[in-house]
Amino acid sequence: MRKSLLALSLLAATSAPVLAADYSDGDIHKNDYKWMQFNLMGAFNELPGFPDGSNHDYLEMEFGGRSGIFDLYGYVDVFNLASDPGSDKSGKEKIFMKFAPRMSLDAVTGKDLSFGPVQELYVSTLMEWGGASEVNSQKIGLGSDVMVPWLGKIGLNLYGTYDSNKKDWNGYQISTNWFKPFYFFENGSFISYQGYIDWQFGMKDEYSSSSYGGAMFNGIYWHSDRFAVGYGLKGYKNIYGIKEVNGVDSTGFGHYIAVTYKF
């Protein structure tokens, strides 16, 4: 399963021609693959902070793949692993979960819906659960796989956001993600540039102190077949629609380190 993902990454990295999804032959499972890994993470100055950013550790189970008409990415984070009373996460929600299933319109219709750099179209969803009073939202919209210079294939999705805590729709989000191997070693391991952008806009004044906000993660990781080690710089701007004011830190930079084991 992991080899399938690696093969796709290597294909993009070598700039080989990438064909649009074609399911006209009826075989919707020909592009199936799956992967899973555990990441031991350290976060430094993670935002938002009240009043300062958080420094803490957590374990992340991360997974994804493709099965027929469905494309999936997700993770489950478990915070404060040792239940340290001195941790910034002590007394707070223990788990955060994110699931992002997409349904391929190309596979559903059996037609090639590609155009220009757009390789495949999806109905995209995104579900985030952070506990009783934390971020709890569901998003739905239009998604795509797009070919861009150097990076290769990226995911690009536009959602409308439903806030489960408020029981109301609240703005929109545009998201993109990428994975680009760019340096290869003789033993088959490689270094990648990987990351994502999540940008919210059009949020209502009654629910958010800022109508816009988001984050960008830029990671440099070393990968082998079984392990990965990396550093990520995450930039925040009014994250979650929280405006930067006295006593609230929602704009700035956070730092992340990760040690990964792949299954």
From Swiss-Prot:
Out of the domains of life, which is the source?
A: Bacteria
Q: Which UniProt keywords apply?
A: Cell outer membrane, Membrane, Signal
Primary role: Serves as receptor for a broad-host-range vibriophage, KVP40.
Give the signal peptide range: 1-20
* Gene for this chain: ompK
Pfam families assigned: Channel_Tsx
User: GO cellular component terms?
Assistant: cell outer membrane
- Compartments, as annotated in UniProt: Cell outer membrane
Its recorded name reads Outer membrane protein OmpK
Where is it mainly found? membrane
Record's keyword annotation contains Signal:
yes
- Report the family membership: Belongs to the nucleoside-specific channel-forming outer membrane porin (Tsx) (TC 1.B.10) family.
